[in-house]
């Protein structure tokens, strides 16, 4: 055999790779990284421009301390690079077009690139655009026949230049995912209604800081929707006047907002999991505060407003529920009645030292089939209205939500984050009162193994527990200890 035929160098191996494999390899790289491979050989010179996914990331965005002249030069180079790649590509189909650009990238160029990819029947647009002036998003995007996923983010948020969406006709027959982050909807509720009505197969909707608190009414009603995420920052405390959710196919609901004055309709017939981050709303009181004569400015009294009752009724068939600490407060002050959650099997409660557990006794009593209870931290505001939830209240005349609890698995996260002693007493309280408990997992936030040993020994010293068959584990990143509880029962 000719030995020369066996002498295949690395360059020959690279050149001999099938084009399909080359495109597959390049698909794991950003377009900028893929462009570097054009130096490997003449054959690879233009492959980078024909990968199915194009990913452009403005380098200035990652270097905020750059000088003005250098920043301008890099922006010009970046824009030339994007133009060159799209020109090389010609009419070749684009699967995904991802663009992240900061202030200084010409908005006219951004629009040109977006419209170019639309002509290439792009399936997915992922756009993160910062602008120090108002940028009007091209409305042609909303009549695309090819888009399956659309993500639009204003990188500056709502504090600086705005990314404004103004839709005319909307027809997105293939769109399944719509993600809007910090964008401004022109004509507000009309724009949102037109946009959603043109998405006939939409399955996932994410709205981040698309503030609707000042609209007369707000509605997210889509019959095909399966996942809905709505989030507004904590600073927006004006309650929305009226909110409607009519999503019979929804299985996942994540909602963080000031609780509305009224929930006109909440239809979640198929809901499986919900995460609620409701906040108490405030409005100026009708009763002004009397101030002394000559006081330099008027004092304004604010009153709690909002009603979460109908929203809670709408999610009552949920199986998995996560409540942020602010929601626990809303249940205390802005919910007339907590519904019965017959299907709920897993409940997670986030704790906060500023929020009491007043609403938890009624909540737990209304979860007759709850199997797993999770606490994200145990420290909370001490009050005299938390029943037997914690040892801060004298034992007489209290509601027995723990002693009648069906919970079998209790998980405590962030243990030891603030006050080990208080959290240990709370944990002992759970063990002494929960009769059906089979497993307690304590996730200790510590890097010191001796802390786990100490807590484990203290748990073993409990005089009696409500459930003799309960197994306890104390877990950290480095160690897991099993605790043997006393066999005698205190009940």
Curated annotation (Swiss-Prot):
One Pfam short name: LRR_At5g56370
Family matches, as CDD domains: F-box_AtFBL13-like (cd22160)
Keywords for the protein's UniProt record, in alphabetical order: Leucine-rich repeat, Repeat
Keyword Disulfide bond: no
Entry superkingdom: Eukaryota
Coiled coil: none
Domain F-box: 11-57
Residue stretches of each LRR repeat: 127-154, 156-182, 184-209, 325-351, 352-377, 419-444, 472-491
InterPro entries: F-box-like_dom_sf (IPR036047), F-box_AtFBL13-like (IPR053781), F-box_dom (IPR001810), FBD (IPR006566), FBL60-like (IPR055294), LRR_dom_sf (IPR032675), LRR_FXL15/At3g58940/PEG3-like (IPR055411)
PANTHER family given in the database record: RNI-LIKE SUPERFAMILY PROTEIN (PTHR31293:SF16)
Protein name as annotated: Putative F-box/LRR-repeat protein At3g59230
Highest classification ranks of the organism: Eukaryota, Viridiplantae, Streptophyta, Embryophyta, Tracheophyta
